[in-house]
From Swiss-Prot:
Gene Ontology annotations for the cellular component aspect, listed alphabetically: cytoplasm; membrane
Role: Acts as a sodium-dependent hypoxanthine transporter. May show xanthine-hypoxanthine exchange activity.
Organism: Mus musculus (Mouse)
Gene behind the chain: Slc23a3
Keywords: Cytoplasm, Membrane, Transmembrane, Transmembrane helix
Name used for this protein in its record: Solute carrier family 23 member 3
Lineage, top ranks: Eukaryota, Metazoa, Chordata, Craniata, Vertebrata
GO biological process: hypoxanthine transport
Length: 611
């Protein structure tokens, strides 16, 4: 009985639930054959087992990010500082993140993006709580040692303020969700995108990768040996052994079966290292988690999250100011995350209607999180996008499964409490590797522009340096900003401490105020003024594919005709289908860019910008 030879089969997404397969390049001659693409690939049929395996690893990254955010926000919480178990607060965040993820992948941006709390929500929350709750002080002899002032008694005056402070943070999250949803409903991304080139996106991604280095170092410092072991295992599995193909067992008859080889090490580059280091950490007992957050509590086994479970969010002028800064920073971060995910999956750039829907549903998720009492909103997760790059595959089915996992775990606070035992070195190692991928993706975007230009060198350097300098200055300034009005102080301190927003804002202003040619800015050097018939066909095919991948699902698409005119920015336009334009004869060249290259369409500009 002869057996078919072993050979790897590229994993292409099939069916409605899977992520789009990689699109062909806009112009074949411009493709660099020597470059290694970060294409979305699936090895063999996308089985449910493989999807569950990938979803479990994305869930581990999400759980690490979620638990790290709660640790940073509640690290000064005295025993008894909350009127409910901290595990219940974590379960509420799991539920809101899961529901937001399902909505985002179903009718939002349609990209396989996981929704999670981001640094853009954490920074204003820390500013809001620290300004109102000075529960920690620094000892004269050791500037790095923080002592809780109210850890020995539950009758301290500051303890009853914790619930009020967290209610105020939840109110800020609700405000941010409402504002972010409004930004999406008004179609702001479609109006801003034509003015955003590689010199706006690249600094934002670089700063996004660097912005969490302090928190990552804090988690890794709990045990540098375990953290370095985790990082080493993740790098070896995803990079050094990433191309090792292992045959997948098949239950079909050998005469008709095709033996599929899959890169097991790359597909397990998160689960295997995390499980190994978690086991070692439990064996040696190095998990250093605050007792008030990890001790066994009376959290229920089953709990149905609903608004007003503890108390309703508190809306104050300071919460309003913090919520505005959250919305501006989270919107900037999410738009960069959309572009990064499309770049890693080798897709066409997300169209304005997909970005508008994505921001609208992220705002809805943040409103839901705030109403459920969560102190952190939901936004597209950069660490999970970095995980997509490690796996080199992305799937909407995987994102749906992650959302369902989170919603199921959010119904059981007792099960959610299990993830409070994640060791700190694991948190630091996972976030460190995934953030490094985001950083490298930002650097890879510089090649689209003329990086040797003095104009571009100044824009890149100034945007990145000032985005990292201003938050550091605010954090260590001897005198805080004091305008005499507390809400304005809160707004300035929160917004100026958001590095991703600062990088995007500075890059946007400098890019559009300093004169430069389109080729110098990276907006037109790859787009010729005329195309052959074959190139026209490929361009139309690419547009049709983009319309298929970013378009609304059929039940929702049929309702577009009933949507009021001001909300038509959420629906695909007729020209997005790619059917416009006549056919050309073989060898004929058609001018798609009349009036020279200075006036080509927004879609073409975005296509060039994301290549």
């Amino acid at each position: 009985m002869s057996r078919s030879p072993l050979h790897p089969i590229p994993l292409l997404s099939e069916g409605y639930q899977d992520t789009p397969a990689p699109l062909p390049p806009l112009l074949p001659p411009l493709q660099n054959p020597s470059s290694r693409s970060w294409a979305s690939r699936v090895f063999g049929p996308s089985t449910w087992g493989l999807s569950c395996l990938l979803a479990l690893q994305h869930f581990l990254v999400l759980a690490s990010l979620l638990w790290a955010s709660h640790l940073l926000l509640l690290h000064g919480l005295p025993p008894g500082g909350l009127s409910y178990p901290p595990a219940q607060l974590l379960a509420s965040s799991f539920f809101s993140c899961g529901l937001s993820t399902v909505l985002q992948t179903w009718m939002g941006s349609r990209l396989p993006l996981i929704q999670a709390p981001s640094l853009e929500f954490l920074i204003p929350a820390l500013v809001l709580t620290n300004q109102k709750l000075p529960l920690t002080t620094k000892t004269p002899g050791n500037a790095s040692l923080s002592l809780p002032l109210c850890s020995l008694t539950r009758s301290c005056h500051g303890l009853e303020l914790w619930n009020t402070s967290l209610r105020e943070v939840s109110g800020a999250v609700v405000v941010s969700g409402l504002l972010q949803g409004t930004i999406g409903l008004l179609g702001v991304p479609g109006r801003v995108f034509p003015y955003c080139g590689p010199l706006v996106l690249a600094p934002s991604l670089v700063v996004a990768g660097l912005s969490a280095h302090k928190e990552v170092a804090q988690f890794c410092s709990a045990h540098w040996g375990l953290a370095l072991l985790l990082i080493l295992l993740m790098v070896v599995c995803s990079q050094h052994l990433g191309s090792c193909q292992i045959p997948l067992c098949s239950w079909r008859p050998s005469s008709t079966s095709t033996h599929i080889c899959i890169p097991v090490f790359r597909l397990l580059s998160v689960l295997a290292p995390v499980a190994c280091v978690w086991f070692i950490s439990a064996f040696v007992g190095t998990s250093v988690i605050p007792l008030q957050l990890s001790e066994p509590s009376d959290a229920p086994w089953f709990w149905l999250p609903h608004p007003g479970e503890w108390e309703w969010p508190l809306l104050t002028p300071r919460a309003l100011a913090a919520g505005i800064s959250m919305a501006l920073a989270a919107s900037t971060s999410s738009l960069g995350c959309y572009a990064l995910c499309g770049q890693l999956l080798r897709l066409s750039p997300p169209p304005p209607h997909a970005c508008s829907r994505g921001l609208s549903l992220e705002g809805l998720g943040s409103v839901l999180a705030g109403l459920l009492g969560s102190p952190l909103g939901t936004a597209s997760s950069f660490p999970n996008v970095g995980t997509v790059s490690l796996f080199q595959t992305g799937s909407r089915r995987v994102a749906h499964l992650v959302g369902l996992f989170c919603m199921g775990l959010g119904l059981s606070p007792r099960l959610a409490q299990l993830f409070t035992s994640i060791p700190l070195p694991v948190l630091g190692g996972v976030l460190g590797v995934t953030q490094a991928v985001v950083l490298s993706a930002g650097f890879s975007s510089f090649h689209l522009a003329d990086i040797d230009s003095g104009r571009n060198v100044f824009i890149v350097g100034f945007s990145i340096f000032m985005a990292l300098l201003l938050p550091r200055w605010l954090r260590e300034a001897p005198v805080l900003l004091n305008t005499g009005w507390s809400p304005l102080d809160m707004f300035l301190r929160s917004l100026l401490a958001e590095p991703i927003f600062l990088a995007g804002l500075l890059g946007f202003l400098l890019e559009n105020t300093i004169s430069g040619t389109r080729a110098e800015r990276g907006l037109g050097q790859r787009l010729p003024t005329s195309f052959t018939a074959q190139e026209i066909q490929m361009l139309q095919q690419s547009r049709r594919k983009a319309a298929q991948e970013y378009g609304l699902p059929l039940p929702i698409k049929n309702l577009c005709s009933c949507i009021p005119q001001p909300l038509h920015c959420l629906c695909p336009m007729p020209e997005d289908s790619g059917d416009e334009g006549g056919s050309s004869k073989t060898g004929e060249r058609a001018d798609l860019l009349p009036n020279s290259g200075e006036s080509y369409s927004t879609a073409s500009r975005e296509g060039v910008r994301s290549q």
